[in-house]
C-alpha cells in the first residue's frame, strides 16, 4: 500500500524552530510538497520545496489562492516577549496568527508551533 502524502505550508523558516520543522517535513515520506511562506529566502534547496515571499504578514490576503490546495499549515512564526509591551506582543503573535489563519482553506489542519 502506498503512503498517503500531504502538502504542507511552513512559516518562520528563517528562524530556528521553523527551519527545523521545514527540514523534517522535507525528509518525511508522508509529505509530497512543502510551501515555505516567508519574507526572505530560506537558503535551502530541495525538490519538494517551494517558496512564496510575503512582504507583510499583517496583510496576508494575497496568499488565499496560493494555499488553497494544501492540507496542513505549521505556523512557526514568533518573537520573544522580552522587552516588549503586552499590546505589541499580542499584535505580533496572536493578531498576526489569526489574520494568517483566516486565509487558509476551511479544511486545512492549522498548528501554531
What are these regions (language model features)?
Residues 32, 71, 108:
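Conserved acidic residues
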Residues 30-33, 48:
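Glycine-centered tight turns that cap/initiate beta-strands
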Residues 10, 75, 109-113:
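Structural signature of the Rossmann-like NAD(P)-dependent dehydrogenase/reductase core
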Residues 35-40, 98-113:
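Conserved Rossmann-fold NAD(P)-dependent oxidoreductase catalytic core, especially the SDR/UDP-sugar
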Residues 2-30:
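N-terminal Rossmann NAD(P)H-binding glycine-rich loop of SDR-like oxidoreductase domains
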Residues 41-45:
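Short, charged/polar "capping" segments at the starts of alpha-helices
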Amino acid at each position: 500500500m502506498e503512503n498517503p502524502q500531504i502538502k504542507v505550508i511552513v512559516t518562520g523558516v528563517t528562524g530556528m524552530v521553523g527551519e527545523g520543522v521545514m527540514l523534517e517535513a522535507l525528509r518525511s515520506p508522508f509529505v509530497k510538497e512543502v510551501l515555505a511562506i516567508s519574507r526572505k529566502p530560506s537558503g535551502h534547496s530541495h525538490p519538494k520545496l517551494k517558496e512564496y515571499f510575503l512582504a507583510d504578514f499583517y496583510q496576508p490576503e494575497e496568499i488565499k489562492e496560493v494555499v488553497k490546495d494544501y492540507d496542513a499549515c505549521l505556523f512557526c512564526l514568533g518573537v520573544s516577549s522580552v522587552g516588549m509591551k503586552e499590546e505589541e506582543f499580542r499584535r505580533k503573535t496572536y493578531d498576526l496568527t489569526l489574520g494568517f489563519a483566516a486565509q487558509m482553506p476551511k479544511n486545512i489542519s492549522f498548528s501554531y508551533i
